[in-house]
């Protein structure tokens, strides 16, 4: 009975897409009425805070680049679709671990972008963290708050109102999954906040310190969430629909720090429009690697084509005082391996 309840719940659950991702495609000229799929609260916040929307748009480009970096050696490589308001296409309709990662990294990207814009004085509604004033102390002793501490609390609060608005309104199984992974994303940024200090005193003796709180490079957040993706936990809804139960009883329960997902991923080997898979035909692979970037894994056993190409690289670089590095340009001939396309009959079965 419990299994049947979960199955019906998942089948009938409407799919939730994050239409606000499209803000990144619109760029600086964000027109709220042109973003499809926003709920009323999101549209109102969009109209009220055009400067924050611009920051979110710039941030979207950054987190998409980070997603593509993290999955550059993966069959699914975080590809985006032009002129598609879902940005990633039908692949996001499946409640898979890839979807879990995208929700987490996108939310982290919004938090990061808004917090940075605050510190740079680009937003009317916030600036540096007002709580970081006066004196404080750490394990090295006392210090004075100074400089401009990143206002991470504001960077988290606005996305909770804007990004989470659609999921909070729907309150279905997929929405709960999205909210959980959103939380993982925003807490990942906060996890890597650093205390940075400048020493004052004779010859830098550090008798006095001025310190401020600053976000780490976004790559740290991306690396952390990729590790969470690797350890993501498959879940089902619990019987009262208020939370999650682990799908496999041999695995530990999901915590607030874990990414969660409902459905297994497709293999992403061949183009499959219904699953949103672009396939791996034509993808560059590593002939000798046994990892996910290796030709055997990337090409799904179909084999690969080898093309000899000549490219220009910098070589014989030397440092010249002061202060430049000068390089020669050298020709280099290398073999590039790309995955073969599937046989036509195999491809037709997936379309």
From Swiss-Prot:
Residues 1-16 form the signal peptide. One of its GO terms (biological process) is cell fate commitment. Pfam families: wnt. Palmitoleoylation is required for efficient binding to frizzled receptors. Depalmitoleoylation leads to Wnt signaling pathway inhibition. Expressed maternally in both vegetal and animal blastomeres with enrichment in the animal hemisphere. Expressed zygotically near the prosencephalic-mesencephalic boundary of the developing brain in neurula and tailbud stages, and also in non-brain areas at tadpole stages. PROSITE patterns: WNT1. Glycans are attached at residue 77. Belongs to the Wnt family. PANTHER family: PROTEIN WNT-2B, WNT RELATED. This is Protein Wnt-2b-A. It comes from Xenopus laevis (African clawed frog).
């Amino acid at each position: 009975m419990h299994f049947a309840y979960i199955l019906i719940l998942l089948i009938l659950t409407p799919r939730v897409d994050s239409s606000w991702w499209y803000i990144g495609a619109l760029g600086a000229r964000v027109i709220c009425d042109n973003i499809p799929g926003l709920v009323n609260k999101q549209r109102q916040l969009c109209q009220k805070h055009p400067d924050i929307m611009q920051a979110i748009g710039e941030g979207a480009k950054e987190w998409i680049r980070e997603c593509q970096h993290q999955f550059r050696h993966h069959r699914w490589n975080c590809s985006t679709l032009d002129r598609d308001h879902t940005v990633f296409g039908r692949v996001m309709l499946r409640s898979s671990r890839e979807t879990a990662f995208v929700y987490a990294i996108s939310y982290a990207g919004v938090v990061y972008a808004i917090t940075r814009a605050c510190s740079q004085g680009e937003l009317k509604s916030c600036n540096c963290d007002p709580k970081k004033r006066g004196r404080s102390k750490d394990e090295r002793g006392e210090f004075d708050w100074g400089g401009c501490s990143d206002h991470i609390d504001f960077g988290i609060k606005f996305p909770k109102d804007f990004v989470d608005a659609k999921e909070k309104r729907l309150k279905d199984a997929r929405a709960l999954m999205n909210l959980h992974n959103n939380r993982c994303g925003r807490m990942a940024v906060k996890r890597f906040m650093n205390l940075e200090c400048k020493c004052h005193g004779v010859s830098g003796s550090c008798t006095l310190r001025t310190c401020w709180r600053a976000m780490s490079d976004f790559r740290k957040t991306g690396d952390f969430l990729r590790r969470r993706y690797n350890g993501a936990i498959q879940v089902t809804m619990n019987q009262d629909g208020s939370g999650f139960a682990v799908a496999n009883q041999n695995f530990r329960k999901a915590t607030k720090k874990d990414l969660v997902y409902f459905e297994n991923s497709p293999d992403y080997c061949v183009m499959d429009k219904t699953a949103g898979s672009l396939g791996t035909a034509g993808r560059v692979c590593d002939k000798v690697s046994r990892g996910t970037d290796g030709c055997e894994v990337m090409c799904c056993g179909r084999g690969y084509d080898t093309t000899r190409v000549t490219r220009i690289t910098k070589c014989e670089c030397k440092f010249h005082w002061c202060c430049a590095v000068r390089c020669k340009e050298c020709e280099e001939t290398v073999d590039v391996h790309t995955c073969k396309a599937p046989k036509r009959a195999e491809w037709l079965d997936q379309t």
